């Protein structure tokens, strides 16, 4: 079984790795299509996608393609690879009709479709405090995440997971699901999506990390969803790191400092309170919350803003 893999970030790399390192000799990854290297950090040095890095670091004999668009000559390149399936995981591009007709294009999407179509389904699961997390495989069509569902897998949340932990868990689940979908493709009954039930999620931006001390539960969930990027920060750009939800009922002044100890600072919200372990000012290293407050001469009863 010849597979062309299309994917870019770490989530896709976990699934690509599983396909490449599988012990089933019937699966062969014959090509990687991924996004172009992009400037990263203050020095704007080019950074390769995680999927590309995995192939290069492991000296794998898998050709890598990073086209700006999926037109000619890329369509012919795809045809020449003679894939039995094209597997798409967080690629970042919509596939044109010319690609969709080369081979069945199977997308692993990190939600229980038709819920959370779009770029940030895992963020949305966390932000909406979902109790059930899941992933779907679907047969791609010309619209965004609207194709027939092939299979899905899910689990009941037992504890809160941040973006990194949930992404990793769903990626491993997605790899297992893809193996099943590829193996049983010819016998799977496709399930058309109920488009009336579809919900959509947008691309995350830096501005999404801006928070205030209004609702403790919402602030806590944002800290989980935006842990890797953009993190969460106040209007003065002070980052709140390692945030825990203490309670979500009592009413306090926004940003009121309720307690200070070695575990961090307990901060009141209009609804509830959170404990913040570390604080980081712009251009500075993270500090224990207690040390940061001492440096700013902020005490119990003061306002963190």
From Swiss-Prot:
Any single Gene Ontology cellular-component annotation: cytosol
Top EC group: transferase
Keyword Membrane in record: no
Pfam families cross-referenced by the UniProt entry: Formyl_trans_C, Formyl_trans_N
Catalyses which reaction(s): L-methionyl-tRNA(fMet) + (6R)-10-formyltetrahydrofolate = N-formyl-L-methionyl-tRNA(fMet) + (6S)-5,6,7,8-tetrahydrofolate + H(+)
Keywords annotated in UniProt: Protein biosynthesis, Transferase
SUPFAM superfamilies (UniProt xref): FMT C-terminal domain-like, Formyltransferase
Xref: Gene3D superfamilies: 3.40.50.12230
Residues annotated for (6S)-5,6,7,8-tetrahydrofolate binding in this entry: 111-114
UniProt keyword Repeat, yes or no: no
EC number: 2.1.2.9
Record-linked InterPro entries: Fmt (IPR005794), Formyl_trans_C (IPR005793), Formyl_transf_N (IPR002376), Formyl_transf_N_sf (IPR036477), Formyl_transferase-like_C_sf (IPR011034), Met-tRNA-FMT_C (IPR044135), Met-tRNA-FMT_N (IPR041711)
MF GO annotations: methionyl-tRNA formyltransferase activity
Its biological purpose: Attaches a formyl group to the free amino group of methionyl-tRNA(fMet). The formyl group appears to play a dual role in the initiator identity of N-formylmethionyl-tRNA by promoting its recognition by IF2 and preventing the misappropriation of this tRNA by the elongation apparatus.
NCBIfam families (alphabetical): fmt
Stored HAMAP family: Formyl_trans
Family: Belongs to the Fmt family.
Protein name: Methionyl-tRNA formyltransferase
Gene name of the encoded protein: fmt
């Amino acid at each position: 079984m010849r597979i062309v893999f299309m994917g870019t970030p770490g989530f896709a790399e976990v699934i690509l790795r599983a396909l490449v390192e599988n012990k089933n000799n019937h699966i062969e990854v014959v090509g990687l299509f991924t996004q172009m290297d992009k400037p990263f950090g203050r020095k704007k040095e080019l950074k390769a996608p995680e999927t590309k890095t995995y192939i290069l670091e492991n000296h794998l004999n898998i050709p890598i393609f990073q086209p700006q668009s999926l037109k000619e000559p890329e369509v012919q390149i795809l045809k020449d690879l003679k894939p039995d399936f094209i597997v798409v995981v967080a690629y970042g591009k919509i596939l044109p009709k010319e690609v969709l007709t080369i081979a069945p294009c199977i997308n692993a999407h990190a939600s229980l479709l038709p819920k959370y179509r779009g770029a940030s389904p895992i963020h949305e699961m966390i932000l909406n405090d979902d109790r059930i997390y899941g992933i779907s495989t679907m047969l791609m069509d010309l619209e965004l995440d609207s194709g027939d569902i092939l299979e899905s897998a899910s689990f009941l949340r037992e504890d809160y997971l941040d973006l990194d932990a949930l992404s990793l868990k769903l990626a491993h689940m997605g790899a297992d699901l893809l193996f099943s979908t590829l193996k049983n493709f010819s016998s799977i009954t496709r399930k058309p999506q109920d488009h009336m039930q579809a919900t959509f999620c947008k691309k995350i931006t830096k501005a999404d990390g801006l928070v205030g001390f209004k609702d403790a539960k919402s602030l806590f969930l944002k800290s989980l969803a935006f842990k890797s990027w953009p993190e969460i920060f106040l209007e003065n750009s002070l980052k709140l790191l390692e945030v825990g939800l203490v309670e979500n009922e009592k009413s306090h002044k926004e940003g009121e400092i309720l307690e200070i100890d070695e575990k961090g600072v307990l901060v009141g919200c209009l609804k509830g309170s959170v404990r913040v372990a570390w604080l980081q000012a712009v251009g500075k290293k993270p500090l224990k919350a207690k040390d940061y407050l001492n440096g700013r001469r902020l005490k119990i009863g003061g306002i963190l803003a």
